[in-house]
A protein has these predicted regions:
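N-terminal amphipathic/basic-hydrophobic helices that include classical n-h-c signal peptides
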Residues: 1-25
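N-terminal topogenic module of multi-pass integral membrane proteins
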Residues: 26-124, 128
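Central hydrophobic cores of alpha-helical transmembrane segments
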Residues: 114-123, 172-181, 218-230
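Membrane-proximal helix-loop-helix units in multi-pass membrane proteins
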Residues: 128-194
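Membrane-helix boundary connector in multi-pass membrane proteins
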Residues: 185-197, 204-220
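Juxtamembrane boundary at the C-terminal end of a transmembrane helix
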Residues: 232-242
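Membrane-water interface at the C-terminal end of transmembrane alpha helices
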Residues: 155-170, 208-222, 232-234
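Hydrophobic cores of alpha-helical transmembrane segments in multi-pass inner/ER membrane proteins
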Residues: 93-103, 149-161, 202-207
Length: 242
């Protein structure tokens, strides 16, 4: 055989190996969760635009609430005074919950990545554009955290989409997601346990509902395992994005 023939044969072998790996990976992921009902391209575009505008609206509202507290309508001011909505929106838990909902209710893992990324692009951009051009300041260090989180959000959304599957791996993934959410919603130690706010308690409960399993027993087991995982995570990574 000539050198060219050997090279071509090597290339074909490499392509075959890559194709084999791709097929195995697709089968592995489909065993966790498969696309249930394909949707049209028009519907995909509409959904992505909708979550983009949702992000823009929530980012703008969050910064408005933070910057214009003294100018809020009396009812909204009273609600904010009781629930401390401004600080609640400044923490991670609510945004992680919204992203989780967008992810698992998307049509596929790829769509979850696109939709969640669009949401965070809209939310983070509107928040910091408002902060810079209307409020007149730009908190660079805090913004860098959100920019980084936005950059990795497609990967996280891709993984989270599979949490609604029926396999054992999906069950473990759901428990791990809840563990992260638990550490964002609660502060605890050897002799104390507190919720950051009543709104964070609601966030965690909604997370449980969204990730619930087919039976009450399985859901309760998932919640219990998530708390154990949360404590273990707290030992390894004591810093929380809260």
């Amino acid at each position: 055989l000539s050198v060219v023939e050997l090279f071509i044969g090597f290339e074909y072998n490499e392509i075959d190996k890559l194709e084999f790996v791709r097929v195995i990976m697709i089968k592995f992921l489909n065993d966790i969760r498969n696309v249930e009902k394909p949707i049209s391209n028009n519907r995909k575009i509409i959904n992505t635009i909708a979550v983009l505008f949702l992000g823009i609206a929530l980012g703008t509202f969050s910064k408005f609430l933070d910057f214009r507290q003294a100018e809020l309508p009396s009812v909204l001011m009273a609600i904010n005074g009781v629930l401390d909505i401004g600080n609640f929106l400044g923490r991670f838990a609510i945004w992680v919950l919204i992203a989780l909902c967008i992810s698992i209710y998307s049509n596929s893992a790829i769509r979850a990545s696109i939709n969640v990324f669009a949401f965070f692009i809209g939310m983070v951009a509107s928040y910091y554009l408002y902060s810079n051009y209307i409020a007149g300041f730009f908190p660079r260090s805090y913004a860098m955290i959100w920019f980084g989180f936005t950059a990795v959000s497609p990967l996280l959304a891709f993984v989270c989409w599979y949490a609604r599957g029926k396999s054992k791996l999906a069950f473990i993934l759901s428990a791990l997601i809840l563990a992260v959410l638990f550490n964002m919603c609660f502060v605890y130690g050897c002799w104390y346990f507190n919720a950051k706010s009543v709104l964070e308690v609601i966030v965690f409960i909604i997370g449980l509902i969204v990730l619930r399993r087919d039976t009450l027993r399985s859901s309760a087991l998932m919640g219990t395992i998530s708390i154990v995982l949360a404590v273990l995570l707290d030992m390894v990574i004591p810093f929380h994005f809260g």
